A protein has these predicted regions:
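ABC ATPase "signature
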Residues: 74-75
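Helical segment within the ABC ATPase nucleotide-binding domain
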Residues: 29-41
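H-loop/switch region of ABC-family ATPase nucleotide-binding domains
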Residues: 50-51
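A short, surface-exposed alpha-helical micro-motif characterized by mixed small hydrophobic
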Residues: 56-58
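ABC ATPase C-loop
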Residues: 1-3, 7
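A short, proline-enriched helix->beta-strand linker immediately N-terminal to the Walker B motif
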Residues: 8-12
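Catalytic Walker B motif of ABC-type/P-loop ATPase nucleotide-binding domains
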Residues: 14-17
Length: 132
């Protein structure tokens, strides 16, 4: 109801602080799809603050990584998740799918791109590896 009231005002920008906190995976998916659909229809920008790193590559176009109030890096999900050591240095983990690909690459010597951070991207990498 609160979100609907805000959207009626047709804001150009919406700032959300940890909107997925406390939600189960289905609730997270439903909320994020709703936000994505409504904002695309109304051409609204969402600035999202989150610690849920698995949501970020799915829904973000641009990422700003911050640590202790300072910007550490800025870029697309592909650019950001291609820097796993930088993320770890600032106490962030990789998305689960990136972590899995990183393990396959480092420990099992699979020729996969460990910076991939979405399920569809991982599927392409695994199919490419299987075809080799």
């Amino acid at each position: 109801v609160a979100f609907a009231g805000i959207m009626v005002m047709q804001p150009e920008v919406i700032i959300l602080d940890e909107p997925t906190a406390g939600l189960d995976p289905v609730g997270i998916s439903e909320l994020m799809h709703l936000l994505q659909d409504v904002c695309r229809q109304q051409h609204t920008t969402i600035i999202l603050s989150t610690h849920d790193i698995d949501v970020v590559p799915i829904y973000a176009d641009v990422i700003d990584v911050m640590d202790k109030g300072h910007m550490v890096t800025h870029g697309t999900p592909a650019e950001i998740f291609a820097q796993p050591e930088l993320l770890r240095e600032h106490h962030l983990r990789l998305p689960r799918i990136s972590h899995l690909l990183e393990i396959l690459h480092k420990e099992d010597h699979w020729d996969v791109d460990a910076s991939v951070s979405t399920i569809s991207g991982a599927r392409k990498e695994l199919l490419r590896h299987a075809a080799e």
